[in-house]
């Protein structure tokens, strides 16, 4: 196994570069809902990009499942992209979209805690170990390549065990986002009005008017898996796809090419800007100080770009809505920019479709242990239902 991984690593390290240096142009660059005039704000643009957490292949971590691979080189790229999208959601949740990372500067304690959620250890809630093991419940063997929809389902299930970040993760189905279902999942009611610091219960079983604001809102990670063509992206979707990167709720997109995943964070013209996980670095652990050396978790090189028409049509868009007003604003933007198209990229509907099974907000299954440590073996995944993976990535 190790010799095979070494072969992969050598191939990956000499991966041909895409477009890197930004051209001399007056065009705007959009990065995760923020615009940067390229000519006047290039340094600010590069700083914004390097502030994103960058997760790549790693080697020399403890074997997954005790006897599995100790490197994810060659198969873990979509998992790493999923980690990057989720990490951006957590940054927005705790530090805000405008927070910026500065090299070798002391960072907020929330930043370190977020980073430690993704370390390559079985006891970290969003580690490669946890994601790969949870993928078994989605029909993926450990060491098998994941598609965007599978990663979205894995994130949704792992988030149930993450009490600190307390995210509601909604993964759309059949290219349709249902407002009523999201409000049921995210609106929470206090247990006893006299105790504002008390625990909260979801209002999922209550019939409520979704036009009435919630008393409290569980931060929402919204993932929309899409297929934007058969063997290649249909040009009719290009403008709507780009509009999603302009939305202030944007977490970018998961996608790429068959068996080569990238985390897309913005665009310039008709070129997508992405972070590339195809670099193999050595496992980094928590130091004696209790902190993590974060120098290898930020990409300090100029980001890569590719033509949007070269994108494989199987993608997943991500959005983060910290408060209910953010979600309501997102709905308005979708109605204005996405639903106006003759061939819509996805649908946004108010009510749960009558021909669908009833919506049941995801709940943590009953297990004997709690937190990330619960997935010690694939036998413990039987409480989760298998989600149908609709994506059919083109080959060749």
UniProtKB/Swiss-Prot annotation:
GO terms for biological process: autophagy; lipid metabolic process; protein delipidation; protein transport; proteolysis. Cysteine protease that plays a key role in autophagy by mediating both proteolytic activation and delipidation of ATG8 family proteins. The protease activity is required for proteolytic activation of ATG8 family proteins: cleaves the C-terminal amino acid of ATG8 proteins to reveal a C-terminal glycine. Exposure of the glycine at the C-terminus is essential for ATG8 proteins conjugation to phosphatidylethanolamine (PE) and insertion to membranes, which is necessary for autophagy. Preferred substrate is GABARAPL2 followed by MAP1LC3A and GABARAP. GO terms for molecular function: cysteine-type peptidase activity; protein-phosphatidylethanolamide deconjugating activity. Belongs to the peptidase C54 family. It catalyses: [protein]-C-terminal L-amino acid-glycyl-phosphatidylethanolamide + H2O = [protein]-C-terminal L-amino acid-glycine + a 1,2-diacyl-sn-glycero-3-phosphoethanolamine. Coiled coil: none annotated. This is Cysteine protease ATG4A. A motif (LIR) lies at residues 390-393. Signal peptide: none annotated. Interacts with ATG9A; the interaction is direct. Inhibited by N-ethylmaleimide. Redox-regulated during autophagy since reducing conditions activate ATG4A whereas an oxidizing environment such as the presence of H(2)O(2) inhibits its activity.
């Amino acid at each position: 196994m190790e010799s095979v991984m070494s072969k992969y690593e050598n191939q990956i390290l000499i991966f041909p570069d895409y477009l890197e240096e930004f051209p001399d142009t007056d065009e705007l660059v959009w990065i995760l809902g923020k615009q940067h005039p390229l000519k006047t704000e290039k340094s600010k643009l590069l700083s914004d990009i390097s502030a994103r957490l960058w997760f790549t292949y790693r080697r020399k971590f403890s074997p997954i499942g005790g006897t599995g691979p100790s490197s994810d080189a060659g198969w873990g790229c979509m998992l790493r992209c999923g980690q990057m999208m989720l990490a951006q959601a957590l940054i927005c949740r705790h530090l805000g979209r405008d927070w910026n990372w500065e090299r070798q500067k002391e960072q907020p304690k929330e930043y370190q805690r977020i980073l430690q959620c993704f370390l390559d250890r079985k006891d970290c809630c969003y580690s490669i170990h946890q994601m790969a093991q949870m993928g078994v419940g989605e029909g993926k063997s450990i060491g098998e390549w994941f598609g965007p929809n599978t990663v979205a389902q894995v994130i949704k299930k792992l988030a149930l065990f993450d009490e600190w970040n307390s995210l509601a993760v909604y993964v759309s189905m059949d290219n349709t986002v249902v407002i009523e279902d999201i409000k049921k999942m995210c609106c929470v009611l206090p247990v006893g009005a006299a105790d504002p610091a008390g625990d909260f219960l979801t209002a999922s079983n209550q019939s409520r008017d979704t036009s009435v604001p919630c008393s409290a809102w569980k931060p929402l990670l919204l993932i929309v898996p899409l297929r934007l063509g058969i063997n290649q992206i249909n040009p009719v979707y290009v403008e709507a796809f780009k509009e999603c990167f302009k939305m202030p709720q944007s977490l970018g997109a998961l996608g790429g090419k068959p068996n080569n995943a990238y985390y897309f964070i913005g665009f310039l013209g008709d070129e997508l800007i992405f972070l590339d996980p195809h670099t193999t670095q050595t496992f980094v652990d928590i130091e004696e100080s209790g902190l993590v050396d974060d120098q290898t978790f930020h990409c300090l090189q100029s980001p890569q770009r590719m033509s949007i028409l070269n994108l494989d049509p199987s993608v997943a868009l991500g959005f983060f809505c910290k408060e209910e007003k953010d979600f309501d604003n997102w709905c308005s933007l979708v109605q204005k920019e996405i639903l106006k198209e003759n061939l819509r990229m996805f649908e946004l509907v108010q009510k749960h479709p009558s021909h669908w099974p009833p919506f049941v907000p995801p709940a943590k299954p009953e297990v004997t242990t709690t937190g990330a440590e619960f997935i010690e073996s694939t036998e413990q995944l039987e409480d989760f239902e298998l989600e149908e993976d609709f994506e059919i990535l083109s080959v060749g």
